[in-house]
Amino acid sequence: MIKVSDAAAKQIAISVEQMGENKMPLRVAIKVNEDGSFHYNMGFDDRNLDGDKTFEEKHIPFVVDAASIALITGMTLDYVEIDGKHEIVFLNPNDPNYKAPTES
């Protein structure tokens, strides 16, 4: 399903601890825009909706809606520094705008 880098797993664990969201899974969803581009959503969510798929990666519980399952397969969450700012990024080879990361 989703791969999680060590850096992203560490940052998610920090967020869980700060927010006290110990048992809530992390919901990941993708909306395909009219132009075919992907819009990503991610947040803690304790709802269990019809068609949801749940799984665990690096001790992080995830939930994905049925429409996003095929779109997230093979995706990696990473935590990187971009222009001096740290953020979680979605590295998704299924995304039409995906560019493989390069070392700088």
Residue ranges of each PLM-predicted region?
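Short, structured protein-protein interaction patches enriched in aromatics and acidic/basic residues
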Residues: E21-R47, E56, V63
